[in-house]
Amino acid sequence: MTYEEAVNYIEGIGKFASDTSLAHTDRLLDKLGHPENGKKIIHVAGTNGKGSVCAYLRTMLMEGGYRVGFFTSPHLVRINERFQIGTEEVDDDTFLWAFEKVKEAIDEFLREGGTHPTYFETLFLMAALIFQKAETDYIILEVGLGGRLDATNVIRHPLACIITSISLDHTEYLGDTTEKIAGEKAGIIKKGVPVIFDGNDRAAAAVIRRRAEEMGCPWYELTRDCCIPVSTTTGGIAFDFTWKDEKNGGSAETYRLQIPQIAEYQMANASLAFLTMLILREDHGISAERLAGGISKMVWPCRMETVLRGVVVDGAHNPDGIAQFIKTADQFHRNYKITVLFAAVSDKDHEDMIREIVEGIHPERVITTRIEGSRCISEKALAEEFVRAGQKEVCSEPDVGRAFDLACSERGDGMLFCVGSLYLAGQIKSHLEKK
């Protein structure tokens, strides 16, 4: 089998198969010899910010000289991006090796009467093998969807469980309130394992606290007042992170952190990751100064990323993410005329996102496009929604590459923001790589 054949096989698997049992995943891992056992794993769930938190964790551990495996989703351009050793995606040969091992286990499982694993399960099984072969010191696991029933939740003894900000997303799977969604995310909490979480949604935070206490876990809640901006430039944000472990009577400690991103929401993500590493100090032995150095080196594509002069790509894909995007866009670019390139998938609340964009940054013009895949919304339907929201100048172009080139030419001396979907971000990155 070739690499291309392996990718085609995986892409042909239904992403949301009917069997979501963790026992199902566990039986397949058993056939692979449970490569995940005995590994030092940090497990990360949440609605927004999961990938960024994972990326901060990675650079801090790398700053300490550790070999780090990182399983993430979705990919932007190539499926290999989901499996990273350090900051490098795995090569095609390693990808194919892992797939063939997993395919052998799947075939045996099917002969025994089992059902085929989902798209995400298959990738997770491959990740477990890849990180075992790479002899990683730590593994950072990003939940795919939810938490309680996610394939990654088969792990038994993580070092820490992190839950990032909670908002409404994937409501058809996770529930229609932040409390219900938090309940699904809190499903990753394991007995006695430290829980570090974003507490800015009070209702969601109460659910997470309750679950942590039920499981006998020490828990650490971060709120906005933990992060105080000191200075902001086009090169990033310096801020003071202050933490006081009130439950254990600790005194307040303040750390000056520098993130290389211009988005204010990254302060919370960096703080969650930094606090987690402080809590795990006895395990990794990295000083606070070196951890701060790791924070300053974090790179994570398509999160308020400037890809060309005056052109920013952001992966915000739900109303809460769009609200954070608008806050940053308005702060840095209020003196520029703004062009927006927008696309979305059908299971996202695109009406609210569109309304927030029109009311929040008042674009001079909007160009809508259509991303690849069965879940796409047509560019014409999106354009009509922008008109209903009060946007005056709107045009549509179905091809993402042509839409991007058109938007770049239309922006003039202003700013272009490309937003609405990580899939849009990935297709733009792919388009730029071909130029």
Predicted regions and their residues:
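Short functional linear segments
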Residues: 1-46, 53-66, 71, 107-114
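ATP-dependent carboxylate-amine ligase catalytic core
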Residues: 29, 34-37, 63-156, 172, ...
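Extended acidic/charged loop-beta regions that coordinate divalent cations
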Residues: 123-173, 205, 209-254
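Nucleotide phosphate-binding/pyrophosphate-handling subdomain across enzymes
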Residues: 133, 138-141, 149-162, 166-170, ...
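Membrane-proximal helix-turn-helix segments that form the acceptor-binding/catalytic region
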Residues: 182-190
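Beta-strand->loop->alpha-helix junctions that form or flank phosphate-binding loops
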Residues: 198-199, 211-233, 259-264, 291-297, ...
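C-terminal helical cap/extension that packs against the catalytic core
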Residues: 201-216, 220, 311, 354-415
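Active-site-proximal loop/hinge segments that shape catalytic or ion-binding/gating pockets
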Residues: 421
